[in-house]
Regions:
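Glycine-rich nucleophile elbow surrounding the catalytic serine of serine-hydrolase chemistry
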Residues: 1-8
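Short, structured coil segments at secondary-structure junctions
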Residues: 14, 133-134
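Flexible "cap/lid" loop of the alpha/beta hydrolase fold
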Residues: 14-50, 91-95
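Conserved alpha/beta-hydrolase catalytic His-Asp/Glu region
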Residues: 54-92
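The feature captures the conserved acid-bearing segment of alpha/beta-hydrolase catalytic domains
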Residues: 100-106
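Short beta-strand/loop motif that positions the catalytic acidic residue
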Residues: 107, 113-115, 119
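Conserved alpha/beta-hydrolase "acid-adjacent" motif
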Residues: 120-126
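Catalytic active-site module of serine/aspartate enzymes centered on a nucleophile-bearing elbow/loop
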Residues: 135-180
Length: 180
């Protein structure tokens, strides 16, 4: 949901650049919600239990299957468990109806759209749709899941983002750039 917050911010505010990590697709979350409901029918119950500190083996497996890569260890899932919380109903409604929002003109700025190759929530095939809205570069992190910052492959994601930021700074400082 963090990328949706960044996109909303950019509708009315300026920034030098943006990184959208595992973004909600322009079509909203309805498709992802339906896919999870059909492929992992116990997910919503298990996610709710995990957000209350009930870390059953089934709940942890389901959380891993949806949000993380297979390489993310059970100890890490339990450690991250204190950050699990129920989703905001208002946010869920807003993101479900995202496709119906009137889109304001977008400012021209460098944007990187990053997703995990193993993201079960928003698969990498959807990243180009978000990237097209921003004329952005796409980066797919091999074997990473949805939760890029906590996934076992977080260092690869962080390095890819850091490299992109360094290049964006160099381009902005180059003679003839739009900041001159």
């Amino acid at each position: 949901m963090g990328s949706a917050v960044v996109e909303r911010f950019l509708e009315r505010n300026r920034a030098q650049a943006a990184v959208l990590m595992a973004p909600v697709p322009p079509s909203g979350i309805l498709g992802a919600t339906m896919k999870i409901a059909l492929t992992e029918p116990a997910f919503f119950d298990r996610q709710g239990r995990a957000s209350r500190g009930e870390y059953t083996p089934e709940a942890l497996r389901t959380i891993r299957d949806v949000y993380y890569s297979r390489e993310t260890g059970t100890d890490d899932l339990i450690r991250f468990g204190r950050f699990f919380q129920s989703e905001s109903r208002r946010a869920i409604l807003d993101l479900t109806l995202l496709a119906m929002r009137v889109r304001l003109p977008r400012a021209a700025l460098p944007v990187l759209v990053v997703g995990g190759e193993a993201d079960a929530l928003f698969p990498p095939a959807g990243l180009p749709f978000t990237a097209a809205r921003w004329q952005a570069e796409v980066a797919v992190i091999p074997r990473a899941g949805h939760t890029l910052m906590l996934d076992a492959h977080w260092q690869i994601a962080a390095q890819r983002i850091a490299t992109w930021i360094e290049r964006a700074v160099q381009r902005a400082a180059a003679p003839g750039s739009s900041t001159d």
